[in-house]
Amino acid sequence: MSSNTVKTVRDGQLTLKDGTGTPVTLVVDFEGEGNFTFSDDKSERLTIMDRGTIVGCRKQNDVVKSASFSVNMRQFTDSGGAGSIIDFIMKTGHYAGNVSTGGAAFGDFYLIDVEFRVEGTDFGDTGDHFANLTKCLASYDFAEGFPDVININLEVYGTITRSQA
């Protein structure tokens, strides 16, 4: 059954996961605007032309997908406590022992998985809605303002899987 309820930023939740057997997780809070975005482009395209007229299209190389979100800045690091979001994505401080989700093929980089859950059952849907992004290389930038903001940027080297459960 399709949903009749439009979802809003109040319905979403982001969870970051490492690659251990029982993943170390961080539920993202203080997201501010709730501006999580992702793109799911599959491959480059080669346009086949015949003297300036499009006559076909072929798949080329896979593309690196992307995602991003912002959080209100509370701290850069917290090595003695619960850790910060920067600690999680950079594998530092409290999260220095985290394991990459990339395996040997991505051994030079620490990758994480990201789960975006949108509440559905509270609105009569048959389940909650999920987008799972795997093998994400995360980076961040900081912007001072009202409030200060940490922007998280993700390069998705794995898959983006959409589901309802």
Label the predicted regions.
Residues 1-165:
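Signature of extracytoplasmic/envelope-associated structural regions
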